[in-house]
Amino acid sequence: MKTKRWFVDVTDELSTNDPQIAQAAALLRENEVVAFPTETVYGLGANAKNTDAVKKIYEAKGRPSDNPLIVHIADISQLEDLTGPAPEKAKTLMKRFWPGALTLILPCKPDALSPRVTAGLETVAIRMPDHPLALALIRESGLPIAAPSANLSGKPSPTKAEHVAHDLDGRIAGIVDGGPTGIGVESTVLSCADDIPVLLRPGGITKEQIEAVIGPIHVDKGLSDQNEKPISPGMKYTHYAPTAPLAICEGSPERIQHLIQEYQQGGRRVGVLTTEEKAGVYSADYVKSCGRRAQLETVAAGLYDALRSFDENKVDFIIAESFPDTGVGLAIMNRLMKAAGGRVIR
């Protein structure tokens, strides 16, 4: 398959009349898959109502079939066809954070979507992205768009169109290149099924921001039973991982430097994931800063690009610094723990 690529100059006034967006939307209506930017990461979109289209997402990514997909909409009016009545707290969150990096788990209307989208569950993960290109594409298609991250399953999510092309060129119909994404980590996923909502995946909207609007929420610590069906994307399987094994070190820079030397003595090429403040401290074979520790939003924005760079530099082992698990740091540490497969050095 030849993957078509469009380059779109993104502005807030981006029109659905843009001929490149029209071409991409036409492919979506033909039940093909198209990658496009959102404010979080690039998504791999398909018609959420058509099972054949959704199947192509799973095939292109190599994604397990019990991992549900997030449905993207461009207007609140689309909810009426897809979900049952939303709880009041969900409505409050929509008013405050949509469009934005917040995905809500809501009851799904019977037969409203392909069962491949919900992985057989009675709920659906749904959000409205805060990106002019994404919104224009969804509106032009006239469809709800199922879209996980546009990467091979298990690999770091794409924040640039080049990342998408690296993983999926020849496997999908098209890539809409709208430049790098802003937030850099996926949306926050919140289940509103209970009286007290449950945070299933930390992301671009922080726990603190949500609680400032609706009061206390619970935090899901992750599924302990791997045979359970996940109700949200990103709750199961290793994610976001470069090729080389990665471990998080919660120790001091001196401890990390000692580990570097220890692994190098074994003949391994060692990489370190750090921040601008400490990039000059380590004598590893490859040192990569993903942002400023004093401004964790920059770390989130640069995280996946940094993880991908370790593959390009062919390291054998990666040591990552740890971060505070508050604010957007909770999302950063969630992604690093997934990438590390839970490996932590203290």
Curated annotation (Swiss-Prot):
NCBIfam families: L-threonylcarbamoyladenylate synthase (TIGR00057). L-threonine binds at T40, H72, R127, A147, S187. One of its GO terms (cellular component) is cytoplasm. Its EC number is 2.7.7.87. Keywords: ATP-binding, Cytoplasm, Nucleotide-binding, Nucleotidyltransferase, Transferase, tRNA processing. Belongs to the SUA5 family. It catalyses: L-threonine + hydrogencarbonate + ATP = L-threonylcarbamoyladenylate + diphosphate + H2O. This is Threonylcarbamoyl-AMP synthase. GO terms for molecular function: ATP binding; double-stranded RNA binding; L-threonylcarbamoyladenylate synthase; nucleotidyltransferase activity; tRNA binding. It is found in: Cytoplasm. It is an enzyme of class 2 (transferase). Required for the formation of a threonylcarbamoyl group on adenosine at position 37 (t(6)A37) in tRNAs that read codons beginning with adenine. Catalyzes the conversion of L-threonine, HCO(3)(-)/CO(2) and ATP to give threonylcarbamoyl-AMP (TC-AMP) as the acyladenylate intermediate, with the release of diphosphate. Is also able to catalyze the reverse reaction in vitro, i.e. the formation of ATP from TC-AMP and PPi. ATP binds at R63, N67, T123, S149, S157, R201, Y240. Residues 18-205 form the YrdC-like domain. Its main location: cytoplasm. InterPro entries: DHBP_synth_RibB-like_a/b_dom (IPR017945), Sua5-like_dom (IPR006070), Sua5/YwlC_C (IPR038385), Sua5_C (IPR005145), T(6)A37_SUA5 (IPR010923), TC-AMP_synthase_SUA5 (IPR050156). GO terms for biological process: regulation of translational fidelity; tRNA threonylcarbamoyladenosine modification. It holds the Pfam family Sua5_C. Complements a S.cerevisiae SUA5 disruption mutant.
